[in-house]
């Protein structure tokens, strides 16, 4: 993939954010969002490559062929808007009211993509390479997006030295927090199958409910850990319990529950899955039925250790915002969990307080300030690593 010569072009991050928001790319739809982005990147001298898996559009773009390769990762897909009528401005109109940009994706995370593109436009000459890894499958099942692109790039021998993910990591003020790691996540669907019968004749039935209660009690009784350096304690939550029984005189045939564990690096997903399966087997001993657990690991816990890379980011954010960010591992999962397989990864973006909400919005000056922070990051990065 040969990059055209870098071109000096000025890009307004707010205008590009508006152009992206006007593409109604509700996951898994693309709605032309990738085309909009690709045109801008090609104008800046990037060699762009579409990587489609299933029905999902992904884009890998690179300017330069040498190392180090600094990558920006993000997603153009967005969550559904909910009730259109509840919005102050149309969710895909990208309207600016009193200095605030409204629209689905304004925070999560089309404005961050636009800000990094604008930053790159202001640094036309740099050593090494700059790349973009953009997916249309982050808000959905996340099976044909970043994870597949990472696997393909690794198989081809593509080297990414460091990555910035533009998720909205700031808590209250732009630049007050960056994420250097994330907890892992595992979901378990637990099913206990018994035998339906009349409550007056329990000997003719096999009640799955007490078995499910025993399983859930055992899972909740265990203290998974007391925390891990840089991480809060791992946590298990019961998210659903269902027997599908509306009668008061019927023992149900089956009982189901779902649990989620957010875990720190003290655990591996496979070990937690084995533990859940073991508790199911233990509770079902002597029961005239079966208890099973279907476990799915969404991602393992990871940490990018503080060092030269995080120092560059902290300095750049401080330069642009006047505040030194907290290095955090809080929050949910992101595509950083896949990128960690390629290189050290850190997340930094806008304040996330309105993401996924009606009236998702961001002050336009914060979009421009984020572009300035990204530009400072790019310059500091190549000064440190090239």
Curated annotation (Swiss-Prot):
Pathway(s) it belongs to: Amino-acid biosynthesis; L-lysine biosynthesis via DAP pathway; LL-2,6-diaminopimelate from (S)-tetrahydrodipicolinate (succinylase route): step 3/3
Chemical reaction(s) catalysed: N-succinyl-(2S,6S)-2,6-diaminopimelate + H2O = (2S,6S)-2,6-diaminopimelate + succinate
Cofactor: Zn(2+); Co(2+)
GO biological process, one term: L-arginine biosynthetic process
Residues holding Zn(2+) 2: 108, 139, 356
Keywords, comma-separated and alphabetical: Amino-acid biosynthesis, Cobalt, Diaminopimelate biosynthesis, Hydrolase, Lysine biosynthesis, Metal-binding, Zinc
UniProt-listed PROSITE patterns: ARGE_DAPE_CPG2_2 (PS00759)
GO molecular function: acetylornithine deacetylase activity; cobalt ion binding; succinyl-diaminopimelate desuccinylase activity; zinc ion binding
Active-site residue numbers: 77, 138 (proton acceptor)
Taxonomic source organism: Caulobacter vibrioides (strain NA1000 / CB15N)
Oligomer and partners: Homodimer.
Protein name: Succinyl-diaminopimelate desuccinylase
Residues engaged in binding Zn(2+) 1: 75, 108, 167
Source superkingdom: Bacteria
EC code(s) of this entry: 3.5.1.18
InterPro entries attached to this UniProt entry: Bact_exopeptidase_dim_dom, DapE_proteobac, Peptidase_M20, Peptidase_M20_dimer, Peptidase_M20A
Pfam family for this entry, one: M20_dimer
Protein function: Catalyzes the hydrolysis of N-succinyl-L,L-diaminopimelic acid (SDAP), forming succinate and LL-2,6-diaminopimelate (DAP), an intermediate involved in the bacterial biosynthesis of lysine and meso-diaminopimelic acid, an essential component of bacterial cell walls.
Cofactor binding note of this UniProt entry: Binds 2 Zn(2+) or Co(2+) ions per subunit.
Protein family membership: Belongs to the peptidase M20A family. DapE subfamily.
């Amino acid at each position: 993939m040969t990059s055209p010569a870098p071109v000096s072009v000025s890009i307004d991050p707010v205008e590009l954010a508006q152009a992206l928001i006007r593409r109604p790319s509700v996951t898994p739809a693309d709605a032309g969002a990738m085309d909009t982005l690709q045109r801008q990147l090609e104008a800046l001298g990037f060699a762009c490559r579409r990587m489609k898996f299933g029905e999902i559009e992904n884009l890998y773009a690179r300017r330069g062929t040498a190392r180090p390769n600094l990558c920006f990762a993000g997603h153009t897909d967005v969550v559904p808007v909910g009730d259109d009528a509840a919005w102050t401005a149309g969710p895909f109109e990208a309207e600016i009211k009193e200095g605030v940009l409204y629209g689905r994706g304004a925070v999560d995370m089309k404005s961050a993509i636009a800000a990094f593109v604008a930053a790159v436009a202001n640094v036309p000459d740099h050593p090494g390479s700059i790349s973009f890894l953009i997916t249309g499958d982050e808000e959905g099942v996340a099976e044909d997006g970043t994870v597949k692109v990472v696997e393909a790039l690794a198989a081809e021998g593509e080297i990414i030295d460091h990555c910035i993910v533009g998720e909205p990591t700031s808590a209250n003020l732009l630049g007050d927090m960056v994420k250097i790691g994330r907890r892992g996540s595992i979901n378990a669907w637990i099913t206990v199958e018994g035998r339906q019968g009349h409550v007056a004749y329990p000997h003719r039935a096999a009640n799955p409910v007490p078995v499910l209660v025993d399983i859930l009690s055992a899972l909740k009784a265990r203290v998974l850990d007391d925390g891990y350096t840089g991480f809060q304690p791992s946590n298990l939550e019961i998210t659903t319990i269902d027997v599908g029984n509306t009668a008061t005189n019927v023992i149900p045939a089956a009982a189901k529950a779902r649990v989620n564990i957010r875990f720190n690096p003290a655990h591996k997903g496979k070990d937690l899955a084995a533990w859940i399966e073991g508790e199911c087997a233990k509770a079902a001993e002597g029961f005239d039925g079966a208890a099973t657990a279907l476990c799915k690991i969404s991602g393992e816990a990871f940490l990018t250790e503080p060092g030269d890379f995080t120092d560059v980011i902290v300095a750049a954010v401080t330069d642009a915002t006047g505040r030194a960010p907290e290095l955090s591992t809080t929050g949910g999962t992101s595509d950083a969990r896949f990128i960690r397989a390629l290189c050290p990864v850190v997340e930094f973006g806008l304040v996330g307080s309105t993401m996924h909400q009606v009236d998702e919005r961001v002050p336009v000056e914060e979009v421009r300030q984020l572009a300035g922070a990204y530009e400072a990051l790019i310059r500091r990065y190549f000064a440190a690593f090239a």
